[in-house]
Every structure is written in C-alpha cells, then in structure tokens.
Amino acid sequence: KLSAAAEVKEGKFGAGSYIVRMDQPYSRMADMLLDTQYYNVNDPRPYDDTGWTLGPLRNVKTIRVKDEKILAASMSIINGPAKVTGKVEGVGNAGFVVNHTGESAVTQLRYRLKDVKFSAAEAAFKVGERSFNAGSFIVKTEGNPSDLSARLAKEATDLGLTATAVDKLPDVAQHAVGTPRIALVHTWVNTQNEGWYRIELDRLGIPYDYISDQDVGKMANLREKYDVIIWGPVGGNAQSILRGIAKFSDSEAAIPWKGSALT
C-alpha cells in the first residue's frame, strides 16, 4: 500500500493505492487475475468459468504498470486482507445519507442496524456538490435511537462506506426500507449454485431460512413468512424442477439435505 503519492509513466497514484508487485514468486497469479485475458480464436473454447479479470468485475480501476520506478516507491506490505476503511463526513444533525453504490456492504449496513429506521431515495439527488444515486439511504436523526451517530459511524467505517451528515434532509421522494425476511431454497436438482448463495449470505452476515423445495409445496402462504425467496439457477425445465429427483425405488426414504443421523 503506497505510503505517499507516486508518479510513473502510466500516471500518478495517490497515497493509499494498492500495489501488487510483480517481483515476487506469485506474480503469475496476479497476471491471471488482474490483467486482461486474451483468447486465441483458433484455440479450443474455454471450459467453465473464465471471468477472472477482477478489476472490471469489482468495478475497481486496475492499471498494469511497466515503469519499474513503481518498485522504489514508498509502500508497506499488507499482512491480511486489504480492507477499505469507511468514514463519516459532513456536519449536520438532521440525519445521514449513504450513497447506493450497488455494493453488498450497503445491504450489510441495513441488517446491522435492524432497529434503525431507514428510507431509500426514489430518485437521484445532490447534497452540496456531491451526487447520490436513486436508492441511497436516508437516515433521519429524529425518531431513531440516541446513539445513532456512534453506531452508524462504527458500521460505516467497518464496511468501507461513507456516511454524509446533513443539516437538512434531501428533498426527494423516498420510502421506508426494512430488513427483508429471506428464504434460500434447497433442491437436489442442483446443489452447487444454491451453495454459492449460502456461502455469500453467511459471509455477509445476512440472516436467512434454509428451506427445502418440499417445504415450499407445503406452505400455504409463503408471502406471510418471507419477503424474498432465492432459488439458485438450475438446469432442466419447469417440469423437471417441479418433480425433483426421482426415487430409485418406492421403499427409498427421502434424501437427507441437512445434518441428521443418516448424514
């Protein structure tokens, strides 16, 4: 991580910029994950996942630097995951605004502050010279816990978000945003894709119920219990999804899909 700004042929990079040095044994890994991938049209078609250029995937500006001067720049090694530190900026007691950037951290913030009242802007707006996207959170001081400022600052800092304090709430159409009750559906038709959802929901700390497709058929009113139902991508057609995996014999018991005496 750059300790001070550095300027090379490819441009000027500010303090805090991340440098992946190529004078290390794992430089080939950086090539594979960060540089543009070129495929020869005469080669066999790639099999399975090939979207490995992480910069565009994560909307992070990533530049390959050929100027060796960058290796002499003042920098410090990062021991552990690189993490962006968020902040609270601005002055005001009316409330806070958090831009909707499409990051998962925005959703995490809502769930971490479940008892706080949030609203979402229905159109883009500005606070001073700064622009905010439609969907940005507006958190009023009035009607919220007295420790709102400290709690919001703590979570925004940890999640890498910027919360802007305002002395006047944005004049924009908005609606209340709660914490949706989520169900993730298990089906034996395809377990891999639902597993990716489970991994990410668990990593983000977003609560959900893990239910079987058989449960879905037995519930009289799903809307009464859940606001969002996630069904991972599966192959086949509507009929094969509805029927699921057939038994080998009539005597075969249901296949366990959670921890049990059999599994």
Task: State each model region's role.
Residues 1-263:
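Intrinsic-disorder/low-complexity accessory segments
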